[in-house]
Amino acid sequence: VGNGLQLRGLDGEKRVLMIGAHPDDEDTALLTALARGMGATTGYLSLTRGDGGQNHIGPELGEGLGVIRTGELLAARELDGGTQFFTRAFDYGFSKSADEAFEKWPREALLRDVVWILRTFRPHVIVSVFSGTPADGHGQHQAAGIMAREAFEAAADPQRFPEMAALGVEPWQVEKLYRRSWGDEGTHTLETGRFDPLLGRSHFQLAMESRSQHRSQDMGVAQPVGGRTTELLLWEVAPGIDPTDPGFFAGIDTTLIAGIEALDAASRRAVEDGVVRYRNGLSRAAEALSPSGPWESAEPLAEGLSSLREAEAVARRAAPDSELAQVLARRTEAVEHALLRAAGVTLKVVATDDLVVPGGEVEVEVQLWNGGDSRVGNAVPRLSLPDGWTAEEIAIEEGAGGGGFFGRGVAGSQLGEDGSLAPGALARWRYHVRIPADAQVSGLYFRDEARDGEMYQWPADDPGVW
């Protein structure tokens, strides 16, 4: 199932961002149909973490509830296949109007947060959950709709937030802006209740499992069978897009070589050739995929990956900062992950303690299992540690691990002398990790600093925390 779902997203490049105000505002059915069904890269931007909501599962309110609801959103995205984003806005409670919301949230600062996400995620399409009018009810809902429309224009304007360019974040033109119709006559209908043979249920049913993750809001729902649709209104389009074309992605170049005109003629030919060979490998991998032998797809996928790497290298040399080079780099990483899954390679990292303190020590074991039928080469792990942390590899006695903390039935490392791992073999490495006395205590980045009014404070220009 996982292999098949991954393969769906490896041909072409479609990116969609949904924008709402709170956790549980998102249309999980649409997110699921796009991500799991169409292989699109999807994201949900919630302006807030739902800190002002109710709590049916515990006493936490305010920032504490925001922590819980953040986790619920992340759990929902694990199911529907999306990526989760936030702005710095704190959910202070109910507002009657957008004007009241913008009295609490500095409008320009909030818009900057949304534009930052548009320019870094770079969606082709935005779907706004709300209209930005009093029909949305809650003032924060109205504010979310207004922000979606304003950010659609601002993200493409180099005069808006020009300081982002110094951080490598360039303007981005979103091609289409839709909004949920909510009873209005929609211009586009997307099927969200289609049965998916890979999932064994419909996208809508999976979406309802995703929605049920919002436990603190008592959002548990059934998973009914039958057809379902989402109605959308086309709100705005970029120059050159025909608004009368009925397709959701109509008029948008969603191929892997979109933007290839940024390259010289020789580089274009090389990239086009590499992508054609990659797609052929991808097609053969899909044909070879079998539930009883998923590794049958590994060889054609590996051949396709080799061609993709060649195309990426050409694009990097010819136009290192181009959208094409970035797309090919991301796709190469995604195919590498898909290849490991198809080959039956499993990596497991286990520590002797889930909580450590500054000045403390912990043992970590890395286990690499080749569950497929092909030999794995260059099977050498590298621990990624925070600054100041150190790791020393320690010997594993032959036969150790047959009991005790690191599990039963595990023999000594079966790694070959040439660093390869035979089919069915397990390699193990154990490390003694030391934490420096001045190590920074871990915490939630959005609570590292005190709020400024109704806005969280965190490094606004660090995309790693968004």
Model regions: which residues?
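Metal-dependent de-N-acetylase/amidase catalytic core
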Residues: 1-17, 97-101, 107-347
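Active-site rim/loop-helix segments in enzyme catalytic domains that contact anionic ligands
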Residues: 1-120, 142, 146-153, 157
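Surface-exposed, proline-enriched loop/turn segments that connect beta strands in immunoglobulin-like
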Residues: 349-353, 393-394
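Short, solvent-exposed loop/linker segments at the N-terminal edge
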Residues: 354-360
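Beta-strand-rich structural segments
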Residues: 361-369
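Proline-anchored loop/turn motifs at beta-strand termini and strand-loop-strand connectors
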Residues: 369-411, 416, 436
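Short strand-edge motifs at loop-to-beta-strand transitions and within beta-strands
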Residues: 417, 425-433
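Short glycine/proline/serine/threonine-rich loop/turn segments at secondary-structure transition edges
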Residues: 435-466
